[in-house]
Amino acid sequence: MKKSVQKNVKGKQVNLKVKPSVHDLSKTQQTKLTVGSMGLGLIIIQHGPYLQISHLITKGAAARDGTLQPGDVLISVGYANVLGYTLREFLKLLQHITIGTILQIKVYRDFIDIPQEWQEIYDLIPETKFPITRTTKKTEEAKDGSVTSSDDDEAFDTRLKYYKYPRSTGHYPVRRPMSISREWHGYKKKNHVMRVGKDINCDVMIHRDHKKEVRAPSPYWTMVKQDNEISSSSSASSTSDAFWLEDCTPVEKGSSEPVSRVG
């Protein structure tokens, strides 16, 4: 509590009690960052009505600058006041900013704490680790043959091996997590053979069109054909008689079998 002394019109002293501010928002930080290939190098979450920095990307612009820290609340980015912005509105703002642009960023320090659930999943965010490039089998064999294991290799963080992609999944860009849905439910082309015929066991069955009046083969023509196969000495008169009998065989409308009449 602070006391201030003021004089009234008659010259008497009056003691006024002044309460200090409950929220001290004067603790602000500001810096200038250059937009790079990884943006500003910040991982930002929506914490109530504020945009809060949860993590810094290793080797990003913010990590190299060293001014911003996890837990800072964004006040302004460039000329835009982002207090009350949602993550979607903030993303639209960053989409119009090109690489190489220098932005002045202003934040609140020690204003609100990072939610506990975001602090526990730090190791599950691949962007917090530095990019790991894939090495081919030939380069790995060359390293095994020429270079032996050293203390630096033993001090390497084993948790980073978790982010290496398996060989069977094909080529993926650096720093891009593998899509489980695309890997499990991807379209796989298979060859299928379909059988077409008049048999009922075929995949595609051909049916006869009964609407058309199709003339069945004449039994006389079959008889003459079999006689020709057995004996080659058939006369021309028997063949002509068979054709004459076939021509005289009419087809009744609406019936599938021919009726032979000789008149």
Swiss-Prot record:
SUPFAM superfamilies attached to this UniProt entry: PDZ domain-like
Transmembrane residue ranges: none
PDZ domain boundaries: 30-109
PANTHER family assigned: PDZ DOMAIN-CONTAINING PROTEIN 9 (PTHR22698:SF1)
Domain of life: Eukaryota
InterPro entries, sorted: PDZ, PDZ_sf, PDZD9
Gene name linked to the record: PDZD9
Source species: Bos taurus
Protein name: PDZ domain-containing protein 9
